[in-house]
Amino acid sequence: MMSQPPKVLLLYAHPESQDSIANRVLLQPARHAQHVTVHDLYAHYPDFFIDIHHEQQLLREHQIIVFQHPLYTYSCPALLKEWLDRVLSRGFASGPGGNELEGKYWRSVITTGEPEAAYHQQGLNRYPMSDIMRPFELTAQMCRMHWMTPMIIYWARRQSAETMKHYARAYGDWLENPLPHGGV
């Protein structure tokens, strides 16, 4: 008997989603997976008034949380930052009694506007992507979540359609079997 994949909450945050071909292509396999909930934050909260209790309930119902967004100013879009600050509150995700996310998994799926070579000591950005991702990794740690290796699509808008299909297939394959050794 095959076990069901764990429930995945895909938090998608892109303020100009209609213009992001790369992110639309990446979302396709997720939208077809029964165990994946795609939650478009900008579609749900165009006014930035986040329903904290609803968001926290979604987190409780899923084992793997995917944060899919473009890299904006070495971070995430503003609404996702607001979401992180408000939803992952003390007493829920951290601090005394804040163990609701303990043991869950965090994976970031990031698109960038620059090539991979820009993310090195001698590159345009002077720091590797692992350094830029550190605040997200530390947030996962604060929430007692397991940090998973991020999926980074460099220079996303300049990727060929074939290359983006390859990334989407790899993403879809991962979504079907997201945990090493299949266990939660």
UniProtKB/Swiss-Prot annotation:
<protein>
    <recommendedName>
        <fullName>Glutathione-regulated potassium-efflux system ancillary protein KefG</fullName>
        <ecNumber>1.6.5.2</ecNumber>
    </recommendedName>
</protein>
<dbReference type="InterPro" id="IPR023947">
    <property type="entry name" value="K_H_efflux_KefG"/>
</dbReference>
<comment type="subunit">
    <text>Interacts with KefB.</text>
</comment>
<dbReference type="GO" id="GO:0010181">
    <property type="term" value="F:FMN binding"/>
</dbReference>
<keyword id="KW-0997">Cell inner membrane</keyword>
<comment type="function">
    <text>Regulatory subunit of a potassium efflux system that confers protection against electrophiles. Required for full activity of KefB.</text>
</comment>
<dbReference type="InterPro" id="IPR029039">
    <property type="entry name" value="Flavoprotein-like_sf"/>
</dbReference>
<keyword id="KW-0472">Membrane</keyword>
<keyword id="KW-1003">Cell membrane</keyword>
<dbReference type="GO" id="GO:0009055">
    <property type="term" value="F:electron transfer activity"/>
</dbReference>
<comment type="similarity">
    <text>Belongs to the NAD(P)H dehydrogenase (quinone) family. KefG subfamily.</text>
</comment>
<dbReference type="InterPro" id="IPR046980">
    <property type="entry name" value="KefG/KefF"/>
</dbReference>
<keyword id="KW-0560">Oxidoreductase</keyword>
<dbReference type="GO" id="GO:0006813">
    <property type="term" value="P:potassium ion transport"/>
</dbReference>
<dbReference type="GO" id="GO:1901381">
    <property type="term" value="P:positive regulation of potassium ion transmembrane transport"/>
</dbReference>
<dbReference type="GO" id="GO:0008753">
    <property type="term" value="F:NADPH dehydrogenase (quinone) activity"/>
</dbReference>
<dbReference type="InterPro" id="IPR003680">
    <property type="entry name" value="Flavodoxin_fold"/>
</dbReference>
<keyword id="KW-0520">NAD</keyword>
<dbReference type="Pfam" id="PF02525">
    <property type="entry name" value="Flavodoxin_2"/>
</dbReference>
<dbReference type="GO" id="GO:0050136">
    <property type="term" value="F:NADH:ubiquinone reductase (non-electrogenic) activity"/>
</dbReference>
<dbReference type="GO" id="GO:0005886">
    <property type="term" value="C:plasma membrane"/>
</dbReference>
